[in-house]
């Protein structure tokens, strides 16, 4: 049993920080110490921001994004192409695509991927509302931006099957060589996907 090195409030802060993805126990201790040292500049404003987020953040009933409004800012933006929806696994994927700023479209967050071994079927994901959005008639293209994992591919095939009865185009992100990537450092699966996804030059 490890010795306690601080009061219960500090220990609780460290334990909670350690649950944040990317922070292990050591990183959580360092983060907690930094926050405590910068109490006025960081800890107090962070606590206030987290409390406000807990009160005001909602899940968008249209697309599954997180925002302080429902529907979210993306779904209500009239400048976005409502005819194209990019389907992603998680909100973090949506944010990554938004940072790339490649397309001004709408999104749909599934909340994960199909994984029968983990007990995750279609009913556990945000799939029914995607079908309902497509059935509304405004959507012309669905872009499947799921990860290139077994579960991601299973989900993509399932969605393609579910959307086959609609007069829409279903596409998927190309997989392959990253910008600035050297072929010698890529794995065989990535190279094979790049060859299959080749385009005219």
UniProtKB/Swiss-Prot annotation:
PROSITE patterns named in the record: RECR, TOPRIM
Zinc finger (C4-type): 60-75
Entry keyword annotation includes Metal-binding: yes
GO function terms (MF aspect): DNA binding; zinc ion binding
CDD domains: TOPRIM_recR
SUPFAM superfamilies: Recombination protein RecR
GO biological process, alphabetically ordered: DNA recombination; DNA repair
UniProt cross-references to HAMAP family, sorted A to Z: RecR
Purpose of the protein: May play a role in DNA repair. It seems to be involved in an RecBC-independent recombinational process of DNA repair. It may act with RecF and RecO.
The protein's name: Recombination protein RecR
């Amino acid at each position: 049993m490890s010795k306690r090195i601080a009061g219960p409030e500090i220990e609780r802060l460290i334990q909670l920080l350690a649950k944040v993805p990317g922070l292990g126990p050591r990183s959580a201790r360092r983060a907690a110490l930094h926050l405590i040292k910068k109490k006025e500049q960081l800890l107090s404003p962070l606590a206030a921001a987290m409390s406000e987020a807990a009160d005001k953040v909602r899940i968008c009933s249209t697309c599954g994004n997180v925002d302080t409004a429902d529907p979210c800012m993306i779904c209500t933006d009239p400048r976005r192409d409502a005819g194209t929806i990019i389907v992603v696994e998680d909100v973090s994927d949506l944010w990554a695509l938004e940072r790339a700023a490649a397309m001004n479209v709408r999104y749909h967050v599934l909340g994960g991927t199909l994984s029968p071994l983990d007990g995750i079927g279609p009913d556990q994901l945000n799939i029914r509302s995607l079908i309902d959005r497509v059935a509304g008639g405004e959507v012309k293209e669905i872009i499947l931006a799921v990860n290139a994992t077994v579960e991601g591919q299973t989900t993509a095939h399932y969605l393609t099957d579910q959307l086959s009865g609609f007069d829409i185009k279903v596409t998927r992100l190309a997989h392959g060589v990253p910008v600035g990537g050297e072929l010698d450092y890529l794995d065989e699966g990535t190279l094979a996907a790049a060859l299959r996804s080749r385009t005219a030059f």
